[in-house]
């Protein structure tokens, strides 16, 4: 049976709409183990915003929590509007069975701390910790705040049990600050007051009932104003104000063992001040530390970076009614993955045109080559294991582009009876489309470099009418061993024509699969200086620009090699789309080794048969939905 509390609260929200925050419920049976009511679950609060790394660090942190604890978690995620949907998609797709979460709109509370002068890099996100007793609902008694740069090495429930040690006056639990900052030994800094070394606010245990009763909301503001008159601003953000408050109200703090916030910042003296074995590592510095023990602890952090998050919560395949005995079942890709949309970058303003693509680590160099040529926005989904995706994230960050948005899609473990995991190409395309903040999207694959006159492609895109797409001719080297310097082709149609006439370049797949791109009619393209229309032919699969709001999603049952683009273009034809060709732009294929799925297609007749069957089913279903009779 589900807990009466959960059911009652769910019904209250359903029928009265009185919940003050959005919630996703994942009901799980669990046994009451605690000494007071909150101990049958652990309630945690996070502030997630600012730099994209915050989301990646949150996932890294929560992996460490899940690794050592199977308790039930209730997370309170305090985010701004930009981050809420991304974190929601991460948590929903991760599908952790022993966790439910609630969102609180940080934007609504920003003004309550914006008046505080602050020179700390955390900006108002750090100061917002002061508002947690105001943000969290009045029906909640205890909660622990966590910075996302903390890695646990123990069961977090052991820390949660520290609430048992609070006396009647204690409202906060914190670890001592493991540096000399608040001692101000050199006397040169305008340091806020603190008890001794002060306390670090990376982890704060809040007794919310007592805080509300004691008038925290007004008292901390009085303290802040008092010391702002002296110091002018905060140097350590919220930590200065918390410590000044504790200085004035010393009976309200309980000191937590230092092992639960072993600080690794640039100024810390954790090794000499904390002899205990570290249980929670706090990487609380923008700069890498050069301490002797930092490298050792950084390896622990990197291990959680590389840890497969799916190992912490394995999920069932999302296919319903599939039978393991069906020979075609093993050729279907998974279609349920852990996702972080906008993991790197975000298109805050709608763009006119952006490239939409997808890739995995083995095609990273191709993406970098493509991105160097395409100077417009890019929305791309990236697929791989946790370690692979973080390596890719670092490489893309080094491009120093603000118009590239990366959506991370984490590879899932396959079932024992399945063949190798199929690359979920259409799932990835759909992710990249969904999160592209663009009016028009150029659908391409990452092993193509799009070249030509970008000014005219924007103009041609703007002239598209309803149910028209703009095809970008796809070309390739005639001989795979040829290596042409693509930088020479950036806007040189004349050079391309020269190579076409010399037969060193040809239409993509012209000899081995002519129906795929030959209908683009490259002979006409050579002579044209304006867009021209081409007829759809069977198995045509061009790359094209389309209005995003008109673009149907790709069928996610097609993964790896085989019919994944053909079926999408076929659907456009059934919807009466017209295919116009850009006379000024083109794309050139970057050679690469054959993928695993292509090799499988070539050697496995069952694979080919199953995908042909799936293609026919797709055609019939699409035709039926559109009211078309197939010939």
From Swiss-Prot:
Pfam families: Glyco_transf_49 (PF13896), Glyco_transf_8 (PF01501). InterPro entries: Glyco_trans_8, Nucleotide-diphossugar_trans, Xyl/GlcA_transferase. Its main location: Golgi. Glycans are attached at residues 95, 105, 167, 177, 287, 400, 485, 502, 521, 529, 593. Signal peptide: none annotated. GO terms for cellular component: Golgi apparatus; Golgi membrane. It comes from the Eukaryota. The keyword Glycoprotein applies. CDD domains: GT8_LARGE_C (cd06431). This is Glycosyltransferase-like protein LARGE. It comes from Caenorhabditis elegans.
């Amino acid at each position: 049976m589900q807990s009466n509390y959960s059911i009652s609260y769910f019904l209250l929200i359903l029928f009265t709409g009185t919940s003050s925050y959005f919630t996703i419920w994942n009901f799980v049976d669990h046994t009451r183990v605690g000494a007071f009511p909150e101990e049958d679950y652990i309630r945690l609060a996070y502030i997630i915003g600012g730099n994209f790394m915050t989301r990646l660090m949150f996932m890294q942190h929560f992996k460490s929590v899940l690794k050592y604890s199977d308790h039930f978690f209730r997370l309170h995620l305090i985010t701004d509007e930009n981050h809420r949907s991304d974190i929601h998609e991460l948590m929903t797709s991760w599908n952790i069975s022993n966790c439910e979460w609630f969102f609180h709109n940080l934007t609504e509370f920003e003004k309550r701390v914006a008046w505080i002068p602050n020179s700390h890099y955390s900006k108002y996100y750090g100061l917002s910790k002061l508002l947690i007793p105001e943000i969290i609902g009045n029906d909640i008694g205890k909660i622990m705040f966590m910075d996302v740069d903390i890695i646990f090495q123990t069961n977090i429930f052991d820390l949660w049990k520290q609430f048992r040690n609070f006396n009647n006056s204690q409202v906060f639990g914190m670890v001592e600050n493991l540096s000399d900052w608040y001692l101000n030994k050199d006397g040169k800094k305008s340091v806020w007051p603190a008890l001794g070394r002060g306390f670090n606010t990376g982890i704060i245990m809040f007794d919310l009932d007592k805080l509300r009763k004691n008038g925290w909301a007004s008292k901390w503001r009085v303290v802040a104003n008092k010391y702002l008159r002296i110091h002018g601003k905060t140097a350590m953000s919220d930590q200065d104000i918390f410590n000044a408050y504790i200085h004035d109200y010393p009976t309200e703090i309980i000191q937590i063992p230092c092992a639960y916030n072993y600080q690794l910042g640039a100024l810390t003296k954790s090794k000499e001040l904390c002899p205990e074995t570290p249980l929670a590592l706090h990487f609380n510095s923008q700069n890498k530390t050069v301490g002797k023990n930092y490298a050792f602890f950084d390896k622990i952090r990197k291990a959680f970076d590389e840890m497969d998050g799916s190992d912490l919560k394995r999920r069932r395949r999302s296919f319903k009614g599939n039978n393991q005995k069906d020979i075609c079942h093993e050729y279907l890709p998974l279609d349920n993955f852990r996702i972080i949309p906008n993991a790197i970058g975000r298109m805050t303003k709608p763009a006119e045109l952006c490239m939409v693509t997808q890739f995995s680590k083995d095609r990273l160099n191709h993406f970098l080559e493509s991105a160097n040529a395409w100077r417009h926005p890019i929305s791309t989904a990236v697929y791989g294991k946790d370690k692979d995706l973080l390596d890719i994230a670092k490489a893309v960050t080094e491009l120093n582009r603000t118009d590239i948005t990366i959506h991370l899609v984490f590879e899932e473990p396959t079932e024992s009876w399945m063949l190798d995991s199929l690359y979920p190409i259409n799932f990835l395309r759909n992710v990249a489309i969904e999160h592209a903040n663009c009016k028009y999207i150029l659908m391409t694959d990452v092993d193509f470099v799009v070249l030509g006159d970008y000014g005219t492609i924007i103009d041609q895109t703007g002239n598209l009418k309803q149910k028209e797409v703009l095809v970008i001719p796809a070309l390739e080297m005639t001989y795979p061993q040829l290596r042409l310097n693509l930088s020479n082709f950036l806007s040189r149609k004349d050079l391309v024509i020269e190579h076409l006439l010399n037969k060193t370049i040809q239409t993509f797949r012209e000899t081995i699969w002519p129906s795929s791109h030959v209908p683009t009619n490259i002979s006409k393209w050579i002579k044209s200086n304006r867009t021209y229309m081409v007829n759809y032919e069977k198995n045509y699969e061009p790359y094209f620009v389309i209005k995003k709001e008109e673009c149907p999603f790709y069928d996610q049952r097609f993964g790896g090699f085989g019919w994944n683009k053909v079926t999408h273009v076929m659907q456009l034809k059934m919807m009466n789309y017209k295919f116009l060709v850009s006379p000024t732009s083109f794309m050139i294929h970057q050679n690469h080794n054959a993928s695993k799925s292509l090799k499988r297609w070539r050697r496995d007749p069952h694979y080919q048969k199953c995908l042909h069957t799936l293609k026919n089913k797709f055609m019939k279903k699409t035709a039926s939905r559109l009211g078309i009779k197939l010939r």
